[in-house]
Swiss-Prot record:
InterPro entries from the UniProt entry: Aminotransferase_I/II_large (IPR004839), AON_synthase_class-II (IPR050087), AONS_Archaea/Proteobacteria (IPR004723), AONS_Proteobacteria (IPR022834), PyrdxlP-dep_Trfase (IPR015424), PyrdxlP-dep_Trfase_major (IPR015421), PyrdxlP-dep_Trfase_small (IPR015422)
SUPFAM superfamilies according to UniProt: PLP-dependent transferases (SSF53383)
Broad class of enzyme this protein falls into: transferase
Name under which the protein is recorded: 8-amino-7-oxononanoate synthase
Gene name linked to the record: bioF
Modified residues (N6-(pyridoxal phosphate)lysine): 246
Amino acid sequence: MLLDHLKRAAAERDAQSLTRRRRIAHTACAPHQSVGGIDATPTPLLTFCSNDYLGLANHGSIAHALAEGAHRYGAGSGASHLVSGHSLAHAQLERELARWLAPYIPQAQALYFCTGYMANLAVLTSLGATGATLFCESLNHASLIDGARLARADVQRYPHGDAGALDALLAASTTALKLIVTDSVFSMDGDIAPLAALLEVAERHDAWIIVDDAHGFGVLGENGHGVLEHLGLRSERLIYIGTLGKAAGVAGAFVAAHETIVEHLINTARPYIYTTAAPPAVAHALLTSLEIIAGEEGRSRRAHLTGLIAQLRAGLAVLAAQAGWSLGESETAIQPLIVGDNAAALALSAALEAEGIRVGAIRPPTVPAGTARLRITLSASHSAADVARLLETIARAAPQLHKEAA
């Protein structure tokens, strides 16, 4: 019976400390947030687990633009983009995003999606259906993995960050169309893919690169244009996917690529064609977000975030060495503190929450077995005092955890 089967599966997850449960935020996304049950009095917590890297999710100007967009366009789009749901706000947003990516991708055109998951599925299923072979980085995000599976294409995986191994796979391939698929900033480790080396390999073997810059767009680069600006890359072989619900603070995602590729997606990508367009108000708000990211305020926020990252890493390095944990090789706002054991990661997360600090414990299958961790993420809305409090609280919790484990 289905219910009995599912109950056994749930019991197995519980036994392995793998059960996931949702939490309810009663206030806006911000470092200081109230969290609790739907009818219970919420608890104020200092949070280090959102992807709101620039602190724009609760920005007054963006919230005002969202309300302005709703007043102008209404609450919803009413149809898919190819029927009647493609608004002026959507078109303006796509034009601005194409302008942002034009220095890095010749003849760039942009296409807006409701979510990053949809954008990744759209690109991989549409381009993968052309008889391509997909050469996928081993630590890609789940949406890229699912997209590759749904594409029903030949898929080959290369080890994390290993351009040499990728080169060998491409050299051995006889497929006419070769697509390299990689995250830019890896979501659970925070390190950056060696895109310059990957691009050299792509050019040598007449391949194309699909880059998911979910955690780089808005954060990396002098103007916040993302990983391509950060690394100084330019090529028509780049197919860029950016997320607008993380550093940009709103919702959605986009694909930027040579106009021929984008027109192909408009006409063949099922996740784009067969869904209702996002509310135009969201696109309208994103135009304000882009102005902030590229302006002086955005530069100031990125500079502040860089300082917080250095402060956190310096403190975590000491704590990890003392506790026998490890600190990931990340220079981004994603800082993994790798504890190892699932139960230990949950216990550390719970100990922090008991002191008023919320940090998520990440366990398999999201990360490999034996690498359970606290995924600490920073926002430009955090203060140096917030980071100091986190470090002090981890320092107090660590000895007790080791005592209980002994």
